[in-house]
Amino acid sequence: MGQAAWKGFVLSLFDYKTAKFVVAKSKKVGLLYRVLQLTILLYLLIWVFLIKKSYQDIDTSLQSAVVTKVKGVAYTNTTMLGERLWDVADFVIPSQGENVFFVVTNLIVTPNQRQGICAEREGIPDGECSEDTDCHAGESVVAGHGLKTGRCLRVGNSTRGTCEIFAWCPVETKSMPTDPLLKDAEGFTIFIKNFIRFPKFNFSKANVLETGNKHFLKTCHFSSTNLYCPIFRLGSIVRWAGADFQDIALKGGVIGIHIEWDCDLDKAASHCNPHYYFNRLDNKHTQSISSGYNFRFARYYRDPHGVEFRDLMKAYGIRFDVIVNGKAGKFSIIPTVINIGSGLALMGAGAFFCDLVLIYLIRKSEFYRDKKFEKVRGQKEEDNVEVEANEMEQELPEDKPLERVHQDEQALELAQSGRKQNSNCQVLFEPARSGLQENAFVNMKPSQILQTVKT
């Protein structure tokens, strides 16, 4: 028995099992299935492969370097500064040319400051006082300019004044001018040189045209047809970012310069081109008290006596952030097979949906359900039925088969209950039989026929 079991197991390893298909002649379900197949196929071809290019291996670990250079000059003539010519060393910070740089467009200058004793500026709450006890000596003025000396300085007969402080005097008191100091900054140019590399594919490129013409960068400007001349006019960048130059030059702001690289390496390297986008990154709402961008810096000097003094400058301007992003794709068999397999799985989901419609939703669903699902008894149940049938046959007389006994019993019962009615007698003819014999049973469908005869 054990050897037979093992033999059957070993032989079963070489069996091939296949599905049994039922062809349903339903035009509605068939049409639905073809529509689903066509939809999935179009999704796979158009969206997955043509648009998303999911047959490619993608590299998003972009390595990038940015070098910037600003050029231009501006002339001013003010009461405080007199006639002055401004060049890149005056208005570009930092001068190294990094991916974040600042261009000064407006200034508030407080010249000739020296360390000493003076009054705090009005309008600073912690620096206001009514008497000397309001100014604690040695304390710094919150959001102010120096350390309190302990004295309250009042002008004339006023009851309110400001604390005396030790600071760089005189303190900054001027307000913002109504017009930007460097109006001509709109015509400055910015040269943005970008080098990128995708390490997975060992692919490198720059946004500057490879040419031997030394005068190319001196004569060209960026345009939609000249992508490899990354020289931008400052006013154009601000306009492309959706801002007004005179407004942003007065109070300052932050502009984002985005460089996008989307490279299909299945094509030639000439098809891998940079794309530029510009937007304003800071809070540009006019009602906000924190709008704009500014900071302070100083230039220090010494007088003939060796005493240090400085010119304090509060600079307003535009900060530019150069942000580089990108990805590269190249054909790979692995993502291709994965996406084809996903499409085939969607095909199977479509067939499953059509099965649900066929066996549950349409008018003849019960008929198709009976054809699709076949009930088969297990081997043990078949053996039990066969044993019971054999036992019943052995209990009957040999000359009376099982179906004949059933007929005799029915005829006897009807004869005992029969009676005459109006000199007529109901005679029960032998019932008609139909059916097939399965497992020693006969499926009987008796059809009793009553016939009236005269006596």
Curated annotation (Swiss-Prot):
One of its GO terms (molecular function) is voltage-gated monoatomic ion channel activity. Residues 51-339 are extracellular. It comes from the Eukaryota. Residues 1-30, 363-455 are cytoplasmic. It is a multi-pass membrane protein. The chain crosses the membrane at residues 31-50, 340-362. Disruption phenotype: P2rx5 deficiency results in protection against LPS-induced inflammatory bone loss in a manner that involves defects in both inflammasome activation and IL-1beta production. One of its GO terms (biological process) is regulation of skeletal muscle tissue regeneration. Expressed in a number of tissues, with highest levels detected in heart and kidney. Activated by ATP. Slowly desensitizing. Not activated by ATP agonist alpha/beta-methylene-ATP. Highly sensitive to the antagonists suramin and PPADS. Glycans are attached at residues 77, 157, 202. InterPro entries: P2X5_purnocptor, P2X_extracellular_dom_sf, P2X_purnocptor, P2X_RECEPTOR_CS. It catalyses: Na(+)(in) = Na(+)(out); Ca(2+)(in) = Ca(2+)(out); chloride(in) = chloride(out). Keywords: ATP-binding, Cell membrane, Disulfide bond, Glycoprotein, Ion channel, Ion transport, Ligand-gated ion channel, Membrane, Nucleotide-binding, Receptor, Transmembrane, Transmembrane helix, Transport. Disulfide bonds join 118-169, 129-152, 135-163, 220-229, 263-272. ATP binds at residues 69-71, 189, 294-296, 314. It is found in: Cell membrane. ATP-gated nonselective transmembrane cation channel permeable to potassium, sodium and calcium. Unlike other P2RX receptors, the P2X5 receptor is also permeable to chloride. Acts as an important regulator of inflammatory-related bone loss and osteoclast multinucleation. The second transmembrane domain and the conserved Asp-355 are essential for P2RX5 subunit assembly. NCBIfam families: P2X (TIGR00863). Functional P2XRs are organized as homomeric and heteromeric trimers. Homotrimer. Forms heterotrimer with P2RX1. Belongs to the P2X receptor family. This is P2X purinoceptor 5. It comes from Mus musculus (Mouse).
